Amino acid sequence: MERRLIKKEMKKLLGDYIGIRLRENEFDPKGRRQLTFLDDMAHYDLAISVALQWLDPSEDLTWLEWEELKIPLHGRPIYPNRREREAMILSSYAGILMNSIPIEEVFKIYGADSSADSGTIKVPRVSSLCLSLHPFAMLTAPKAAAYARKQSVKSRKVTTNKNATSISAKEANATEWKSSQRFSDTQPKHKVT
């Protein structure tokens, strides 16, 4: 039992050390260096650790209360509510994704036209009912983007099939109407006297 606890503590300490080292090594205040995949992973790790601290209701947050007591009333920080914290977490991860995904891909996912591709066909938007809005589900955004792409392809196929069947039905009705008109023109008209 004690061995497991020591192993668990060592894992935690190593994880914390590696995370801190990554952040220290990747610190670039002037922003001259190009971001790499490791940078994105360090940002992702930081976002997840912050999210877990903020969203875990069993976490002992007495240090926040103690900090509030030391600060005078007019300078007391107002900590955001749960929804605002989730929004902050999502916006930080969205920034990471926006830096790693080309903007054209983002426009394709959401069905908007970029200025460079103004002649392309708009992609129909996926209904937001089938996508999860929970922060930890949204943190798997690349998978969500792939899912949205698949759904938009499916919806495009359905709309083209509907359009094709409606056009063929209209054409069939039009040819039927024309043939009935020709048939009525060839029939002798009977006058009732």
From Swiss-Prot:
One matching Pfam family: DUF5563
InterPro entries assigned: C2orf80
Disulfide feature: none
Top-rank lineage group of the source organism: Eukaryota
Compositional bias of kind Polar residues: 176-186
Region entry Disordered, spans: 155-193
The name this protein goes by in its record: Uncharacterized protein C2orf80
Gene behind this protein: C2orf80
